[in-house]
Amino acid sequence: MTSQNPIFIPGPTNIPEEMRKAVDMPTIDHRSPVFGRMLHPALEGVKKVLKTTQAQVFLFPSTGTGGWETAITNTLSPGDKVLAARNGMFSHRWIDMCQRHGLDVTFVETPWGEGVPADRFEEILTADKGHEIRVVLATHNETATGVKSDIAAVRRALDAAKHPALLFVDGVSSIGSMDFRMDEWGVDIAVTGSQKGFMLPPGLAIVGFSPKAMEAVETARLPRTFFDIRDMATGYARNGYPYTPPVGLINGLNASCERILAEGLENVFARHHRIASGVRAAVDAWGLKLCAVRPELYSDSVSAIRVPEGFDANLIVSHALETYDMAFGTGLGQVAGKVFRIGHLGSLTDAMALSGIATAEMVMADLGLPIQLGSGVAAAQEHYRQTTAAAQKKAA
């Protein structure tokens, strides 16, 4: 089945034509120099997107979840202590993975709709006089709630506590779409995937290791085989992989990085912010609220929109797909049935966003919600017209 409509789930995202063509390539010998000429530019492109000159990048045939496993198994040992916040579906899942690997996780229960509590982290880290906490986990952009956390504040908490713990960041739904500064924020491991900001099909876990994280690899005793970065680094030095690589996706990653860097990282972030702000203007016009509780927490890659009490938000998602062939995101975990999500990341324009807003209006009106047709569209149009005019004036 092939839809001609844009997709508005928060990943996998719309795939531009040049990325589809790059992925759909003839088979090559992945043990030949040809593959090396494809691999190393992709690694360097990712470093630029991460805003790092120091990190080593690893590409595993997996998803963001495999990236998480890469992070913990390559740096930690059974019983090691980890600090995290439980403020959404994906922080819950990362904590669960740590516990399944035999790690000792201290977690701060945080309401869904709030960000990572850097102040509480600072208190806990300051109290850890023996520096038993080895790693701090933080989700930069919680996809289930549409909440952006302040990673720089988490780094400041570590520094204020004079604590040597490593900082691991889940940037699966932020990197490539929202400002991410691996070196400046002192991120030791950054995790993302191919299917969101990089605008590719699922299948690549993209992980950056700082020099400090690389040092931890040598003392880590958690079992790892497939995700062992030592084997991967050995393969890279020989222009190859320790096993068969996803050649087409790596070729696509080259095309993706070229596109992102040609647009300019700051322009990419500004475009995402402008489109997201238009969606938020529509939500206000509908009289609805976001799951994120304060403007500084609003995500520029996904909006989780609360529906009236007693209404099943899943009906919006199913009706949109069945009636208008448009895909929105369902609510997850604690907010399942309470929110629907509009993804606005990757390959997206103002006009594409307007089609999603208009469809959401039709769906909600069909289902009897008190939504005035055209209200959200008009609010978003006004925002896009004003911001486009301002950008053109600035460019002139």
UniProtKB/Swiss-Prot annotation:
Keyword tags: Aminotransferase, Pyridoxal phosphate, Transferase
Superkingdom as given in the UniProt entry: Bacteria
A Pfam cross-reference name: Aminotran_5
Co-factor(s): pyridoxal 5'-phosphate
BP-aspect Gene Ontology terms: glycine biosynthetic process, by transamination of glyoxylate; glycolate catabolic process; glyoxylate catabolic process
Catalysed transformations (reactions): oxaloacetate + glycine = glyoxylate + L-aspartate
UniProt cross-references to CDD domains, sorted A to Z: AGAT_like (cd06451)
Up-regulation conditions: Induced by glycolate.
Molecular function in Gene Ontology: alanine-glyoxylate transaminase activity; glycine-oxaloacetate transaminase activity; L-serine-pyruvate transaminase activity
InterPro entries: Aminotrans_V_dom, Aminotrans_V_PyrdxlP_BS, AspGlyoxATase, PyrdxlP-dep_Trfase, PyrdxlP-dep_Trfase_major, PyrdxlP-dep_Trfase_small, SP_NH2Trfase/AEP_transaminase
Entry keyword annotation includes DNA damage: no
EC number: 2.6.1.35
Residues with the N6-(pyridoxal phosphate)lysine modification: K196
Function: Catalyzes the transamination of glyoxylate into glycine using L-aspartate as the preferred amino group donor. Is essential for the growth of P.denitrificans in the presence of glycolate and glyoxylate since it functions in glyoxylate assimilation via the beta-hydroxyaspartate cycle (BHAC). Can catalyze the reverse reaction in vitro, and also use L-serine and L-glutamate as amino group donor, but with much less efficiency than L-aspartate.
Other remarks in the entry: The beta-hydroxyaspartate cycle (BHAC) consists of BhcA, BhcB, BhcC, and BhcD enzyme activities. Overall, it converts two molecules of glyoxylate (C2) into oxaloacetate (C4) without the loss of carbon as CO2, under consumption of just one reducing equivalent and regeneration of the catalytic amino donor, which makes it one of the most efficient glyoxylate assimilation pathways.
PANTHER family associated with the record: ALANINE--GLYOXYLATE AMINOTRANSFERASE 1, AMINOTRANSFERASE CLASS V
Protein name according to UniProt: L-aspartate--glyoxylate aminotransferase
Organism: Paracoccus denitrificans (strain Pd 1222)
Organism lineage string: Bacteria, Pseudomonadati, Pseudomonadota, Alphaproteobacteria, Rhodobacterales
